Amino acid sequence: MAPTAAQIKSRARALGFHKVGIARADALDGEAAERLGGWLAAGYAGEMRWMHDPRRRDIQQVLPGVRSVICVALSYNTAQGEPAPGQARISRYALGRDYHKVLGKPLKELARWIEASDPGCRAVAYVDTGPVQEKAWAEAAGLGWIGKNACLITLEYGSWVFLGEILTTLDLEANDPHPNYCGTCTRCLSACPTAALVEPAVVDARKCLAYHTIENRAPELPEAIAEHQHGWVVGCDLCQTCCPFNLRAERWGRYSEVADFAPRDPWNEITLDQLADLSDAEFERWSEGSAIRRVKASGLRRNARSALGASGDSLAQAH
């Protein structure tokens, strides 16, 4: 017997997800595809070729016959102190176990349960692994809203959440889209050191520290990026740490209880000097099961040396 929306949500929460919502497969009505097309046409994707996959604009091409999109969120925030002088700065999302692994296992389990409950249906899970506009679907499913920092912001956890989706051929009762509560706030726009937020909710990856420290494979970082690194070597959280909803979540003690997201040694206190001389063997050992592996050892060495050079000495000061 086909599971109901309520049963699926209950099962998702039992599997550990903090938020779950459902959107109809026609909920975006082409608006998201149009926005994505404009973003790509402006060149804002940089060298991220996979963003041009045409399936990203039409979910029916991802799963023919899809009728509902089940969206989940899992908080990953952990308490962070001020970085010490010379400490390498790593985005919070990368300090613990790779989120693809942490979310992927229970999400696939949920998809299998749905298909087992109704053998005639399809249910396919994605965790930042397919041509799916995750934030747009999460907003449509009522999990939160796309903020001016281009992150999905939730009332309970701010933007410190990982997202996952299950595309299914089941026709499920949908949630209402989440209202946007950013209002007149522009803190994130002002906080970005490279002006990568070219307008509210629009990131020009070519100007973004996170893009360059993770996705840019060039031997050297652009000077316009390096001079604003302030110790960042994997990602950048500046447009999130200033967000009132993230600050409120921290005041409320809304930190993730998921043990896999606890910062791992040595990443939570490694220095720029250490990373500048990182060996391939050390990287392979330390990055096992970590999203940092995407950056590669050569990328970390480049980023650390760039940050050290921009600081004027071996102690890059935090922003």
Swiss-Prot record:
Function: Catalyzes the conversion of epoxyqueuosine (oQ) to queuosine (Q), which is a hypermodified base found in the wobble positions of tRNA(Asp), tRNA(Asn), tRNA(His) and tRNA(Tyr).
GO terms, molecular function: 4 iron, 4 sulfur cluster binding; epoxyqueuosine reductase activity; metal ion binding
Membrane-crossing residue ranges in chain numbering: none
Family membership noted in the UniProt record: Belongs to the QueG family.
Enzyme Commission number(s) of this protein: 1.17.99.6
Protein name: Epoxyqueuosine reductase
Gene: queG
Catalysed transformations (reactions): epoxyqueuosine(34) in tRNA + AH2 = queuosine(34) in tRNA + A + H2O
Primary location class: cytoplasm
Binding site for [4Fe-4S] cluster 1: 182, 185, 188, 243
4Fe-4S ferredoxin-type domain ranges (all copies): 173-202
Summary of subunit composition and partner proteins: Monomer.
Domain of life per record: Bacteria
A Gene Ontology cellular-component term: cytoplasm
Pathway assigned to this chain's UniProt record: tRNA modification; tRNA-queuosine biosynthesis
Residues that, per the record, bind [4Fe-4S] cluster 2: 192, 208, 236, 239
Swiss-Prot/TrEMBL keywords: 4Fe-4S, Cytoplasm, Iron, Iron-sulfur, Metal-binding, Oxidoreductase, Queuosine biosynthesis, tRNA processing
Gene Ontology terms: biological process: queuosine biosynthetic process; tRNA modification
Active-site residues, Swiss-Prot/TrEMBL: 128
